[in-house]
A protein has these predicted regions:
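Hydrophobic faces of well-ordered beta-strands that scaffold small-molecule active sites
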Residues: 7, 85-87, 148-150
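Cys-nucleophile CN-hydrolase/nitrilase-fold catalytic domain and related Cys-dependent amidase chemistry
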Residues: 17, 26-107, 111-113, 180-184
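Short polar catalytic/cofactor-binding loops
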Residues: 10-17
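Short loop/turn motifs at secondary-structure junctions
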Residues: 5, 35-36, 82, 147, ...
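Generic enzyme active-site microenvironment
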Residues: 8, 41, 153
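Extreme N-terminal starter segment of soluble prokaryotic enzymes
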Residues: 1-7
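Short, acidic/polar
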Residues: 19-28, 156-163
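Active-site catalytic loop in hydrolytic enzyme cores
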Residues: 63-66, 76, 92-184
Length: 184
């Protein structure tokens, strides 16, 4: 049986979009050097999951487009490294931002875009627009094609989330989660 190594990049954000971009690109390169086939960021890597004690408007203004330069830089890197990358962001959206994951395969192709369905009702996260459901996709990896799905943080508290993904054939469920510590 072939192994697929997944790097859970539980790293602390820098406090700026550009800083997070550079730190994230470096973390992916390090993950590849350590043999990872998939690199997965903690939720909302674009701005860092810093929601507490902040004015909602300040937080909402940090939202970026899911097809913008920040996200696309990780797609190019996925192709360069021949490694899948799950990049997360606070996504601009008309009715309010979304907590989103974009998954690129090892060829740099966007294969899955998923937004957190079960948003939290505390602090500024209540301003998030929930995603429209759980989805799976075929992910081309160095060990072959695997069916992947995703759920973000609080989604995992609902057993139905994983059940839906498993019924869609998910072999791997990626679960980005923000954690206030950095492990190197």
């Amino acid at each position: 049986m072939k192994e697929l190594k997944i790097a859970a990049l539980q790293i602390a954000p820098t406090g700026s979009l550009e800083g997070n971009l550079q730190k994230g690109l470096a973390a992916c390169r390090n993950a590849k050097a350590m043999g990872a086939g998939i690199a997965l960021f903690p939720e909302m890597w674009s701005n860092g999951y810093r929601i507490y004690n902040r004015p909602a408007q300040d937080w909402i203004q940090e939202a970026i487009p899911a097809d913008g330069e920040f996200v696309e830089a990780f797609g190019r890197l996925a192709k360069e490294l021949s490694m899948a990358i799950g990049i997360t962001l606070l996504e601009e959206f008309e009715s309010g931002p979304k907590n989103t994951l974009v998954l690129f395969d090892r060829h740099g192709r966007r294969v899955l875009q998923y937004s957190k369905v079960h948003t939290c009702d505390f602090d500024v996260e209540h301003a998030l627009t929930p995603g429209d459901g759980f989805h799976t996709a075929d992910l081309d990896t160095e060990i072959g094609t695997v069916r992947v799905g995703a759920m973000i943080c609080y989604d995992r508290e609902f057993p139905e989330s994983a059940r839906i993904l498993m019924l869609q054939g998910a072999e791997i469920i990626l679960v980005p989660n923000a954690c206030p510590m950095e492990i190197n």
